[in-house]
């Protein structure tokens, strides 16, 4: 097979990486369905996986436990494979309130959602790449197990255009409407088309940087060209082009009409059941809602909440799993599950929560029983669909260990020669004062500190106390959204503050080489936050620093603490022995802060890097402006910032806010 993946890197595998790469490749070639890579923090697990993908030449899906980690992996894979299709597939909701009913207060909550258009475009781009190419890496969140349009119907709906084909202009416009594209001759944006004489311009739903122009001569396609939507500049002419549907949920008209008949039959049966049980209100409610949906489907081809009829629209039998992203992954595909100790339980937990909410809606006449089949996959369905799988974690869970028959591929030695942190246990009685002393030692040498507490209240009190003592401290909690969380991590790395206090900092999983101390308060309180796995993960946050140290405050050493300390010590000894044998001197890890910055922006392919340099470039340009020109620029940027905020584009608004602050400083600076 032709080698499709081209790995770009300035580094060669080193440390434990070559052996890990070899073992993973051999296991996959020998048909092993499950392998577990135990890789410590900072050991280059992503680079190991990139080498395996490149050598085996297989389309790959990488599952991450949250959007933040998915974005980090996406950025790293884009750097490793700039010539290949690296795609991003996460939930496209910035905000999502599912439909629900609370019987105790007789409250019905309508579905409400805000869709992030850019992520929707990237999802469409991901499925297009899986259908068209072999060299694909899709980085996804647990969103991958939720229902998606049926790939067979999706393929049938595509509009294939070739130069010289005979097709009427009206026929093209009708097909575009079926694909849910809308005509807009004034504003040309993603998912729209416009007509100018005999030319039709289409802005593909999965594209962010090009549109296609169909030039007709009578009923013949004379020319197909790709052009820049903003400037209209022709980029190139092409012999053929395929227009993909605007959404994954598009359905042919014939299938919609057939589905409507099936829905009517189910409605009649359900009405009989409700009337037989004297549920008159529920029967009337269900009839009214379903008939309204049927009317909308007949007239427009879709309705609000059409996903609740997905069983009929995709032609599935009752109880069958929904089509998901896994149905788009080729049969020879590979699955990599990152932070598997978190991701696997997530996959298992999605179905039950969804089922219980929908069961109430069905029982009280808000939905037909078939709505229960609009659901995420069950765990056993996920297992049956998953291709050959590699689990990656510093602390693998019981599921992965069981599936791998207890055999682990270890990646403990870091290419940089860095050792696991030194661990000290200190008494609880003086933990806060001792911590303050340790923080001050780190601040002097420009290093950062992470502190993890057991409760929200304690985290708040500690943050307040440290601030009163003159320390630059921030508090990370569950109410902070993904983007702001990334910005806080970025500010910590930039030195905007020195100490970050949180409850469950281990879930971040972000690279913070500047952190040299992790302090775990009340480490001797057994429980979820102080389990062996949690302690190892938290200690690992200091593993990227040359002076990495972890202090566990506890009056006794619990079983979990002992296991975590012993495991860290075992790894440290192995690392020291390797360094001594090879003559390696541990090196400070240099990770550009730009890498983290890119995660906080909207995930625009190929453009994030340009955007992060904007502030620096502009500061140089602004110094040449007069005070009057600077004031005018501030007013202009403030207007844009408010517009972005109104459109819920908070990342862009935040970027402009930073620029305005810089201009204000420039304006107030002594001349």
From Swiss-Prot:
Per its UniProt entry, which superkingdom is the organism in? Bacteria
Q: Which GO terms describe its biological process?
A: nucleotide-excision repair; SOS response
Q: Which residue numbers delimit the UVR domain?
A: 631-666
Q: Provide the Helicase ATP-binding domain boundaries.
A: 26-183
UniProt GO cellular component terms: cytoplasm; excinuclease repair complex
Keyword field:
ATP-binding, Cytoplasm, DNA damage, DNA excision, DNA repair, Excision nuclease, Helicase, Hydrolase, Nucleotide-binding, SOS response
InterPro entries in UniProt: Helicase/UvrB_N, Helicase_ATP-bd, Helicase_C-like, P-loop_NTPase, UVR_dom, UVR_dom_sf, UvrB, UvrB_inter
Under PROSITE patterns, the record lists: HELICASE_ATP_BIND_1, HELICASE_CTER, UVR
State what this protein does. Answer: The UvrABC repair system catalyzes the recognition and processing of DNA lesions. A damage recognition complex composed of 2 UvrA and 2 UvrB subunits scans DNA for abnormalities. Upon binding of the UvrA(2)B(2) complex to a putative damaged site, the DNA wraps around one UvrB monomer. DNA wrap is dependent on ATP binding by UvrB and probably causes local melting of the DNA helix, facilitating insertion of UvrB beta-hairpin between the DNA strands. Then UvrB probes one DNA strand for the presence of a lesion.
Enumerate the NCBIfam families for this protein.
Answer: PRK05298.1 (NF003673), uvrb (TIGR00631)
This protein is called what? UvrABC system protein B
């Amino acid at each position: 097979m032709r080698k499709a993946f081209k790995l770009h890197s300035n580094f060669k595998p080193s440390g434990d990486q070559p052996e890990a790469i070899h073992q993973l490749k051999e296991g996959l070639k020998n048909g092993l369905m499950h392998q577990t890579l135990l890789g410590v923090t900072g050991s280059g697990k992503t680079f190991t996986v990139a080498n395996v993908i490149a050598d085996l030449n297989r389309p790959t899906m990488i599952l991450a436990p949250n959007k933040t980690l998915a974005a980090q992996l996406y950025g790293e894979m884009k750097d490793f494979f700039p010539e290949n299709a690296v795609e991003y597939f996460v939930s496209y909701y910035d905000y999502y309130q599912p439909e629900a009913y609370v019987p105790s207060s007789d409250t019905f909550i309508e579905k409400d959602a805000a869709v992030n258009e850019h992520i929707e475009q990237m999802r469409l781009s991901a499925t297009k790449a899986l259908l068209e190419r072999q060299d694909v890496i899709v980085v996804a969140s647990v969103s991958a197990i939720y229902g998606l349009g049926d790939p067979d119907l999706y393929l049938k709906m595509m509009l294939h255009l070739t130069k010289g084909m005979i097709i009427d202009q009206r026929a093209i416009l009708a097909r575009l409407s079926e694909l849910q594209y809308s005509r807009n001759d004034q504003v040309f944006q993603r998912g729209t088309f416009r007509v100018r004489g005999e030319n039709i311009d289409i802005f593909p739903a999965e594209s962010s940087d090009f549109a296609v122009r169909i030039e007709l001569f009578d009923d013949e396609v004379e020319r197909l060209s790709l052009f820049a939507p903003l400037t209209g500049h022709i980029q190139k002419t092409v012999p053929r082009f395929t227009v993909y549907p605007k959404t994954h949920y598009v359905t042919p008209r014939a299938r919609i009409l057939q589905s409507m008949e099936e829905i009517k039959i189910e409605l009649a049966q359900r009405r009989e059941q409700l009337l037989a049980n004297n549920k008159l209100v529920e029967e009337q409610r269900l009839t009214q809602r379903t008939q309204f949906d049927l009317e909308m489907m007949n007239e427009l081809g879709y309705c609000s909440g059409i996903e609740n009829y997905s069983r009929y629209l995709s032609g599935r039998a009752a109880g069958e799993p929904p089509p998901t992203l896994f149905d788009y992954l080729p049969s020879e595909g590979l699955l990599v599950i990152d932070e598997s100790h978190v991701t696997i339980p997530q996959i298992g937990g999605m179905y039950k929560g969804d089922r219980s909410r929908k069961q109430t809606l069905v029982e009280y006449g808000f939905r037909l029983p078939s709505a229960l089949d609009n659901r995420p996959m069950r765990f056993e369905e996920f297992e049956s669909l998953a291709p050959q799988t590699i689990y990656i974690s510093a602390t693998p869970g019981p599921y992965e260990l069981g599936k791998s028959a207890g055999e682990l591929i270890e990646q403990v030695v870091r290419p940089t020669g860095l050792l696991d942190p030194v661990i000290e246990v200190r008494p609880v009685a003086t933990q806060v004062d001792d911590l303050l002393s340790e923080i001050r030692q780190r601040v002097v040498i420009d290093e950062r500190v992470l502190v993890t507490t057991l409760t929200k209240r304690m985290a708040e009190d500690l943050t307040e106390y440290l601030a009163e003592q003159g320390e630059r401290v921030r508090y990370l909690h569950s109410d902070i959204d993904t983007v702001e969380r990334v910005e806080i991590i970025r500010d910590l790395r930039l030195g905007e503050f020195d100490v970050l206090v949180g409850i469950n900092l281990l879930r971040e999983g972000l690279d913070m080489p500047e952190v040299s101390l992790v302090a775990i308060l009340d480490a001797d309180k057994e429980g979820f936050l102080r389990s062996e796995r949690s302690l190892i993960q938290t200690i690992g946050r200091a593993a990227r620093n040359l002076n990495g140290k972890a202090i566990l405050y506890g009056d006794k050493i619990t079983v979990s603490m002992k296991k975590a300390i012993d495991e860290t010590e075992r790894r440290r000894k192995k690392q020291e022995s390797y360094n001594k044998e090879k003559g390696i001197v541990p090196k400070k890890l240099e990770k550009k802060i730009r890498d983290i910055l890119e995660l906080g922006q909207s995930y625009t392919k190929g453009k994030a890097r340009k955007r992060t340099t904007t502030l620096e470039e502009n500061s140089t340009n602004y110094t040449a402006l007069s005070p009057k020109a600077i004031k005018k620029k501030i007013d202009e940027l403030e207007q844009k910032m408010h517009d972005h905020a109104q459109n819920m584009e908070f990342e862009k608004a935040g970027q402009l806010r930073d620029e305005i602050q810089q201009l204000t400083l420039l304006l107030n600076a002594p001349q």
